[in-house]
Structures are given as structure tokens and as C-alpha cells.
Amino acid sequence: IGAAALVVGQYYMKQINGELSEMNSKISKLVDFQMAEYKGKVLTLMTQVKRASEFQTEILEDNNLRNEEIQRLQGLETTCMDLLNQANVTISDLSSKEGESFEKYDKLMSEVAIWQKYQGALTEVLYIIADLNYTLHLGAISKEQCYAAYSDMYDMENNLIDKLRKWHEFHKKKFKIDVDQARMERQGIDAVIHKPLELISEKWKYRNIGKEAVT
């Protein structure tokens, strides 16, 4: 291995190691006991990917170890894509549901938000795996080949973002949500009860829903 290639490889490995440590910390803080098994698989994946960046010198300097690590990364890439697909499918399913009330819509949003955190972390891990793969090949294969899986998933997630945007727009109109003021028009019996108070102030026409519900 050329000295320049080794130095560059070690530099990228250190960067990757730091990124994974930060991501691991964020995922560890997510609390959802119903998703404990899924969370465990995500954390295990991160730990396994992190290993490649921790033993950077040994792996890069030994061709046998390097080839073994490349094979191992292929398996981790498949695992990452499986977990990411699960997150994407769940987000897609949730955003196909209509909230019958604002409370039910708010609950759906909370579920989507949790899955989006996993989605974001796993997308980063997939990118890091591509980075590692490219680094370990020392330029022997093209970037396009190394990042192919990441590119496919990235395109899929962009389509999902568009679906989510339309889903939020639908509910924004349905519940007459004012995003800027973090409020919505009262509906049903709530609107009837507060109707007389609207003569005093227009503010009684609305109910506050909190900034977290519209961000």
C-alpha cells in the first residue's frame, strides 16, 4: 500500500469513528420500550461498523485483514438496508393514515418522529459504510459503485419526504392549523362552547397546540 493512500485512509477512518460515536449517543437516548429489539439491532450495527474505524492501521496495512473487512462490510450494508427499509415502510404506512381528530394526528406525528430519527441515523450509517468501503478499496473501485446502495435509499427517502409533506398539508387544512401561531381553529362542541367568548376576543376562536406539534 502506498504511504499516501495509507495516510488518507487513516484520516478518513478517524473522521468516521467520531461520527459513529456521536450517532450512537443520540440513538441510545431514544426511549421507546416497544421498539427495544429494533433499537438494539441499530446499536449493534453501529458498534460493528465502528470497529472498522477503530482498528484503522491494522486493517489498512494488512491486505488479508482489509479484504476480510470488505466482505464483512457487505454483510453490514445488507443489515443496514434491511433496518432502513423497515423504518421507511413504517413511516410510509403511518403517513397513509388519516387522523380522525387532531389528537390522533398528533399521536401519528409522534410515532413518525421516532422512526425518522432511526431513519436519519441509519441513512448516515449507510453513507459511512460506503465511505469505509471506498477507503478500504484504496481507489480500486469507483465511488459510484461504493455509494450505489446509499444513492438508491436516498432517492427513496426523498419520495417519502414528499409524501410526508402532502400528509401534513392535508391535516393542516383539515384542522385549520396556523403553523406560524402554533394554533388551530376550535371544532365541534369546543367551538360551540367558546363561540360567545369570540365577541370578547378573536383569540377564543383558536386553541394553542404547541410549537412541537407544528415543527
Put a short name on every predicted segment.
Residues L6-N64:
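Amphipathic, membrane-active segments
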Residues I1-D32, I193-T215:
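Membrane-inserting effector segments that mediate pore formation, membrane fusion
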Residues L45-Q48, A52, E58-I59, N64-T215:
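Long, helix-rich, hydrophobic modules that act as membrane-proximal anchors or helical bundle/coiled-coil regulators
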